[in-house]
C-alpha cells in the first residue's frame, strides 16, 4: 500500500472527523474536547512539511475520523449514517468550488494568519478564536455555495457558542478536503478503493 494512498486515507478521515463532530455538536451541544482541538488545530497548519503534520503528526488526532470512515464505507450497512455522508459530500463539493477562487483563497490565507497570531494570546478553544474561525467560514466559504444545512437540536443550534463550533468545524472539514485534493483524492477512489481504505482505517 503506497504512502500516498495512506496519506489520502488520512485526509479523508480528517473530513469524516470534522463531519462527525459537526453532527455531535449540533445534536448534543458539545463533543470530545480533545478531538475538537485536534480538528481545529489543522486549520492553522497552512504549510506542512509532510501531510501528517496537518494532524499534529499523529494518527490519534483523527481517531474519531477513522472510526467514522470504517462505519461509512464498511460492509455493515446498519452502521451507515446518511446525515454524516451528506456533510462529507457537501464539504468536498464546496471545496472544489473554493479551489477555483484564487481571490477567496488569498483572503482565506490572510484571515487564518490573523488567527494564528491571536492564538499567542488566547487558547484555541476560547470563544473569541472560535467566533473568528466561524466568521471565516460564514464570510468567505459559505457564500460560494451550495450552503451546507446542518441538522440538530434547536435548543443547542440557537446558542452562539454552538454555532461558532459548528462553523469552525466546517472550516476544519474544508481544510481536510484541501489536503485530500492536493494528495490526489477523488470520488472514484472512494468508490473503487473503499475496501482498502477501510482496512487501513481499522489500524488506527
From Swiss-Prot:
- Keyword hit for Membrane: yes
Q: What is its main location?
A: cytoplasm
Naming one, the record's GO cellular component terms include: cytoplasm
Keyword Lipid metabolism: yes or no? no
Compartmental location = Cytoplasm; Cell inner membrane
Annotated SUPFAM superfamilies: YcfC-like (SSF101322)
Return the similarity comment: Belongs to the HflD family.
Q: What PANTHER family does UniProt report for this protein, alphabetically?
A: HIGH FREQUENCY LYSOGENIZATION PROTEIN HFLD
Protein name per the record: High frequency lysogenization protein HflD homolog
The organism of origin for this protein: Aeromonas hydrophila subsp. hydrophila (strain ATCC 7966 / DSM 30187 / BCRC 13018 / CCUG 14551 / JCM 1027 / KCTC 2358 / NCIMB 9240 / NCTC 8049)
Amino acid at each position: 500500500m503506497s504512502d500516498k494512498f495512506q496519506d489520502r486515507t488520512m485526509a479523508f478521515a480528517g473530513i469524516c472527523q470534522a463531519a462527525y463532530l459537526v453532527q455531535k455538536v449540533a445534536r448534543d451541544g458539545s463533543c470530545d474536547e480533545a478531538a475538537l482541538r485536534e480538528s481545529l488545530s489543522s486549520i492553522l497548519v497552512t504549510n506542512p512539511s509532510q501531510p501528517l503534520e496537518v494532524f499534529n503528526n499523529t494518527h490519534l488526532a483523527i481517531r474519531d475520523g477513522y472510526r467514522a470512515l470504517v462505519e461509512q464505507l464498511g460492509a455493515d450497512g446498519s452502521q451507515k449514517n446518511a446525515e454524516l455522508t451528506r456533510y462529507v459530500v457537501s464539504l468536498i463539493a464546496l471545496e472544489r468550488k473554493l479551489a477555483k477562487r484564487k481571490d477567496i483563497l488569498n483572503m482565506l490565507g490572510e484571515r487564518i494568519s490573523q488567527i494564528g497570531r491571536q492564538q499567542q494570546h488566547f487558547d484555541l478553544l476560547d470563544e473569541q478564536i472560535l467566533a473568528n474561525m466561524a466568521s471565516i467560514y460564514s464570510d468567505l466559504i459559505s457564500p460560494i455555495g451550495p450552503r451546507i444545512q446542518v441538522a440538530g437540536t434547536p435548543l443547542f443550534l440557537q446558542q452562539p457558542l454552538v454555532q461558532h463550533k459548528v462553523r469552525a468545524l466546517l472550516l476544519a472539514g474544508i481544510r481536510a478536503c484541501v489536503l485530500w485534493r492536493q494528495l490526489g483524492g477523488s470520488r472514484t477512489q472512494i468508490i473503487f478503493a473503499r475496501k482498502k481504505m477501510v482496512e487501513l482505517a481499522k489500524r488506527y
